[in-house]
A protein has these predicted regions:
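Non-catalytic interaction-recognition regions
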Residues: 1-234
């Protein structure tokens, strides 16, 4: 039996799939009503819509190569601060950052809307971008490495006397399952992408105001490390 059929096709085919769904239903096929047209908008460049007849179409392989090259140039100052990094490792970082920037910029937009893709904006380490989220993850991993073995967290049940920033971060983590359900119900990866950005913002705000590694109170230190590890896991 067919529970649901999802066709991922551009929004210019919307009428076709509406007619197809209605036709199947009237012909007695029970799955007619379960046909979903997951339409997506067109990708436009800063100087206008991509059109093959006008030669303004950008090849995906060329775009990815350019994003990786731009990422290598933009991130070189940060990469050069890493001790003993090899050229191969630097190239891998550029690949991950460049492709992450491209993927996130596309995913964060409601897929049913047209999107203006700006390569320079997508690769910025500040703002609603993939590199910003990746940098937040790298920051957390650095903290966890420096922390070493974390004490047992099974007794971290006392959530009294928490700051507003800590409570906000905890609430954001609690909201994760609901965000996943919403993304599934709406066929919208943008929900997850924008949740990840909001989570990164909340963590950075928390990290700015609260010491983790230098916290003298062992309970608070363990709790904050647990929060950091959970954010990274999500």
């Amino acid at each position: 039996p067919i529970d649901k059929m999802v066709y991922v096709v551009g929004n210019e085919q919307e009428y076709h799939f509406k007619v197809l769904s209605i036709s199947l239903d009237r012909l007695g096929f029970p799955f007619g009503k379960e046909l979903v047209h997951f339409s997506y908008g067109m990708v436009e460049l800063p100087n206008g819509k991509m059109k093959s007849r006008e030669g303004t179409v950008v090849d995906a392989d060329d775009l990815m190569a350019q994003m990786i090259a731009d990422a290598k140039e933009i991130s070189k100052d940060k990469v050069n601060t890493l001790p003993d990094i090899t050229e191969e490792e630097a190239n891998e970082i550029a690949r991950v950052v460049g492709l992450g920037a491209l993927k996130y910029f596309i995913l964060k937009v409601d897929p049913r809307k047209n999107m203006l893709f700006n390569p320079e904006e997508s690769i910025d380490f500040n703002g609603n971008t993939g590199p910003f989220i990746q940098y937040t993850y790298a920051r957390i991993q650095s903290v966890l490495r420096k922390a070493g073995n974390v004490s047992d967290t099974s007794n971290l049940s006392n959530l009294s006397n928490l700051s507003d920033k800590e409570l906000t971060l905890i609430q954001r983590l609690v909201d994760y399952p609901a965000a996943v359900r919403q993304a599934g119900d709406e066929f919208s990866p943008a929900v997850i992408a924008n949740y990840a950005y909001a989570l990164a913002c909340d963590f950075n705000s928390f990290y700015h105001d609260h010491s983790i590694l230098n916290e003298a109170d062992n309970y608070k230190r363990a709790l904050r490390l647990l929060l950091a590890r959970t954010v990274a896991k999500v």
